[in-house]
Regions:
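C-terminal beta-strand-loop-alpha-helix "lid" module of Rossmann-like NAD(P)-dependent dehydrogenases
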Residues: 1-286
């Protein structure tokens, strides 16, 4: 049985850890509130951009454009959004599993790692990291998203990669986040988004022609999807960390309660033993 000193030392250590996890939970809660407000504010624009492109492709017939068909290269670019820090439950590992447990061939992937944890995990598994941008997850901005998208799109138009994918975490609510993998290029028509009968009477004209219109709008469309995913991932990270720290704080509280009970029992046993020895000594003197 552990001594009173050991129990007290362990209780003190767990209490210190509990204070840290509680503080981290509060920090994540504040960050989550800001990120959630940002995500909700920008979501309508990105959804509208997505529906616009889907509708445009559905009503334009069979357009011929490089953005609409896979390139000749067998290589695939995957932009992977993870966090720079751990202590977020399965947030990072769930994203990495989309890559490692999917249908991709490791030797055909070019990884653009946004977030240090994703880079670490994928590097350890032997994946080729083309670019690393951990700073982007600290304070996501549209300008940074546009700059990275420009480089990834150049790899596509130059024929270095034939397809572009995005792995991110979709923010459903505070307690639910979903790891998702979507294809950015070539653009694929979403039948559910394109089959909107209420928009069928809208007449679309492209100036000077549909191909040149796509040349301008597709990069903005891809950047919009990427930035939207970046904002959602940032919110999801803080939601996942808040849950993890809440669980850790609760577990620490249970352990402290259990150790307090053990300490009191040990103390009671020690007092009882001392009284017994005193009584026995008194009886011996008599």
């Amino acid at each position: 049985m552990a001594s009173m000193r050991d129990i007290k030392r362990r209780k003190s250590s767990i209490t210190s850890t509990q204070q840290i996890t509680k503080a981290m939970k509060l920090v994540s809660t504040v960050k989550l509130q800001k990120a959630r407000a940002h995500a909700e504010a920008t979501d309508p624009y990105f959804n509208y951009m997505y529906r616009t492109v889907s509708s445009m492709l559905a009503k334009s017939g069979n357009l011929e454009h490089p953005y609409l068909k896979a390139g000749d290269s067998p290589r695939k670019a995957v932009v992977v959004l993870t966090s720079n820090r751990g202590l977020a439950g399965g947030y990072n590992s769930n994203i990495v599993k989309l890559i490692t447990h999917g249908d991709f061939k490791k030797e055909e992937l070019d990884i653009y790692a946004v977030g240090a944890k994703g880079e670490e995990l994928l590097t350890s598994k032997g994946y080729h990291i083309v670019e690393s941008a951990p700073e982007m997850m600290e304070d996501p901005t549209y300008e940074d998203a546009a700059a990275l998208c420009k480089r990834v799109l150049k790899a596509f138009t130059d024929g270095q990669v034939g397809e572009i994918y995005l792995a991110y975490t979709h923010f459903k609510n505070t307690v639910t986040q979903e790891a998702k993998l979507i294809k950015l290029l070539p653009v694929e028509l979403d039948e559910s988004g394109a089959d909107e009968k209420e928009d069928s009477n809208i007449l679309m004209n492209f100036e000077p022609n549909p191909e040149e219109a796509l040349e301008l709008i597709i990069p903005k469309y891809v950047t919009s999807l990427f930035y939207g995913a970046l904002v959602e991932s940032f919110a999801s990270e803080n939601g996942a960390r808040m849950q993890a720290m809440d669980s850790a704080t609760s577990n620490a509280e249970d352990m402290v309660s259990d150790l307090t009970l053990k300490y009191n029992r040990a103390r009671q046993g020690s007092i009882t033993q001392e009284l017994t020895e005193i009584i026995a000594g008194a009886n011996a003197i008599e």
